[in-house]
């Protein structure tokens, strides 16, 4: 045996000969159960009592109920802005795709104006009109929630 093995063996022998203290009682009580069973009457499982005092989440205090309505309205506003942004991005992508297309060979006299000055319509494109309508809806909704 080496020196370290010998010292471990001697330590084990000394520890085996040491008297047992009251740290781990094994005596049985009057009811036939162990002392530990009396200390933990509901069982000795480690999770016993872990959820004791857990509050119910079914009922919310009135403070949170009032905030919930405001949060719903705020969420609706965000959804409106998101829809408007999607419409705008779609229009920008469509405009970008049109600008990257090579020009078609047309005589100069046959070019159509982008808007008709007689009827005053600046938005002849259906997509531009849709964008303006959605932005107006969002702004009207924003004005309605501000007051």
Swiss-Prot record:
Sites of Methionine amide modification: 52
Positions with biased composition (Polar residues): 98-113
Keyword Secreted: yes
GO molecular function per UniProt: neuropeptide hormone activity
Any Gene Ontology CC annotation: extracellular space
Subcellular location per the Swiss-Prot or TrEMBL entry: Secreted; Cytoplasmic vesicle, Secretory vesicle lumen; Cell projection, Neuron projection
Keywords of the record: Amidation, Cell projection, Cleavage on pair of basic residues, Cytoplasmic vesicle, Mast cell degranulation, Secreted, Signal
Tissue-by-tissue expression: Expressed in several dozen cells in the dorsal retrotrapezoid nucleus/parafacial respiratory group (at protein level).
The keyword Membrane is annotated on this UniProt entry: no
GO biological process, one term: cellular response to sodium phosphate
InterPro entries per UniProt: Bombesin
Propeptide: 56-147
Region called Disordered, residue ranges: 95-123
Signal peptide span: 1-23
PANTHER family: GASTRIN-RELEASING PEPTIDE
Family membership noted in the UniProt record: Belongs to the bombesin/neuromedin-B/ranatensin family.
Annotated function: Stimulates the release of gastrin and other gastrointestinal hormones. Contributes to the perception of prurient stimuli and to the transmission of itch signals in the spinal cord that promote scratching behavior. Contributes primarily to nonhistaminergic itch sensation. In one study, shown to act in the amygdala as part of an inhibitory network which inhibits memory specifically related to learned fear.
Protein name: Gastrin-releasing peptide
Organism from which the protein derives: Rattus norvegicus
Gene designation per UniProt: Grp
